[in-house]
Regions:
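Glycine-aromatic-enriched surface loops/turns that form tight recognition elements
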Residues: 86-88, 120, 124
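Short, well-ordered beta-strand micro-motif
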Residues: 3, 13, 82-86, 105
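NUDIX/MutT-family hydrolases
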Residues: 93-122
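N-terminal strand-loop-strand
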Residues: 1-27
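Short aromatic/basic micro-patch
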Residues: 26, 77, 103
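The catalytic Nudix box helix
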Residues: 27-61
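Active-site segment of metal-dependent pyrophosphate-handling enzymes
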Residues: 51-90
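C-terminal alpha-helix
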Residues: 124-131
């Protein structure tokens, strides 16, 4: 979930024990549970990872990134779906999966995000939000 609070965006720093490539900065996200829609997953993961539940999802924004990683002897493909939401909450309660968070202005967020594809998602979200 790309989450805006005024002109800032929330980024989380993953702990090294919770994921491959730990220590990277990214948006709140996670795996879909059986029976969930994509948006239900995004909202659940946002709540679990940040404690933030009072959000307004911005209708019409849906972005995806795809990538592969090595899973032993095979390459594993993954697609991540992002939605855009706004909140007035700024207090974050981190899950065990994360070690830090930052509410950053957009320029600083581009510098902090670890992966280029996440930067593109942020660009797309900013452009979409500016045009609604």
């Amino acid at each position: 979930m790309v989450l805006f609070n005024s002109s800032k965006v929330l980024l989380l720093r993953h702990s090294s024990i919770s994921s491959r490539g730990g220590g990277h900065w990214d948006f709140p996200k996670g795996h879909i549970d059986d029976g969930e829609t994509e948006i239900q997953t995004a909202l659940r993961e946002l709540g679990e990872e940040t404690g933030i539940e009072q959000v307004k999802v911005v209708d019409g924004f849906r972005d995806t990134i795809t990538y592969t990683f090595s899973g032993g002897q095979e390459q594993i493909g993954k697609e991540v779906v992002f939605f855009l939401a706004t909140t007035k909450e700024s207090k974050v309660t981190l899950s065990h999966e994360h070690i830090d968070y930052s509410w950053l202005d957009f320029d600083s967020a581009f510098s902090r995000l670890t992966y280029d594809n996440a930067c593109q998602v942020l660009r797309n979200a900013i452009e979409f939000y500016a045009n609604i």
